[in-house]
UniProtKB/Swiss-Prot annotation:
Compartments where found: Cell membrane
Matches recorded under InterPro entries: G3P_acylTferase_PlsY
Coiled-coil region: none
Membrane-topology annotation of the record: Multi-pass membrane protein
A biological process term (GO) from this entry: phospholipid biosynthetic process
Name used for this protein in its record: Glycerol-3-phosphate acyltransferase 4
Family membership: Belongs to the PlsY family.
Domain of life: Bacteria
Length: 232
């Protein structure tokens, strides 16, 4: 096995584990992003709780770390499957960062960065799908459908979308989709977890990325609890 590949494996994870959402929110707003909004350590929660400018900065950073690490792997001469493994480990690092006791974000922006390098056109279609749903405040289902469509696009329509080495890319996209599902399902239990059946909880987490159907109740729960604890 290539020594470069062996070095890039932990490097990919550690780069992914840099929690920019947490760091910027602490530095510029003095808050622990994990205790506000959805509790997610990612750009979307920063936008809701710390402002659009900070959220955009986090988004750009998270996309960039996914794209740059896989581009670096290619520049160092690694094969495509090795580049993809490094990219997936970067996403895993974002989702389960050692610096935050393995409780990170959802890895969507980092996944976008990786996907854009693997196959730009399908990645942009997935992004467009998520943004379209997001316009109607249905971002989580849009992300699920967009990411889920990636292996379909690269596997069955690779010629139309110009996907090179489509079998390898398809396996990579399948891995990316699996990481997203696992991260959603492994979310810590909330005070609402026991209020729904196991089947509904699995569906809600996998498709809606939350424990309950109500989006407004879910994204405001941490902020309300924090204010109550402060006596506000």
């Amino acid at each position: 096995m290539s020594p470069v590949f062996l070095i890039m494996i932990p490097a990919g994870y550690l780069v992914g584990a840099i929690p920019m959402a947490y760091l910027l929110s602490r530095w510029r707003r003095g808050i622990d992003i994990r205790r506000y909004g959805s509790g997610n350590v990612g750009a979307s929660n920063v936008i809701k709780t710390a402002g659009k400018k900070l959220g955009l900065a986090v988004f750009v950073f998270d996309v960039s770390k996914g794209a740059i690490i896989i581009l670096l792997a290619g520049w160092l001469g690694l094969e495509l499957w090795q580049q993809i493994v490094v990219g997936l480990l970067t996403i895993a690092g974002h989702n389960w960062p050692v610096f935050l006791r393995f409780n990170g974000g959802r890895g969507i922006a980092t996944s976008l960065g990786v996907a854009l390098v693997m196959a730009p056109v399908p990645a942009l279609i997935a992004l467009s799908t998520a943004l379209t749903f997001g316009f109607f405040k249905k971002m989580a289902p849009g992300v699920f459908l967009g990411v889920g469509a990636l292996p379909v696009m690269s596997g069955y329509f690779h010629g139309f979308f110009g996907v090179q080495e489509h079998q390898t890319v398809t396996w990579g996209f399948a891995g990316l989709f699996l990481i997203m599902i696992v991260r959603r399902l492994m979310a810590p239990d909330s005070e609402y977890s026991s209020t729904v059946s196991k089947a509904e909880l699995v569906f809600n987490r996998m498709f809606l990325d939350r424990d309950i159907r109500s989006r407004s109740v879910w994204i405001n729960r941490n902020t309300a609890a924090h204010k109550e604890g402060l006596g506000i």
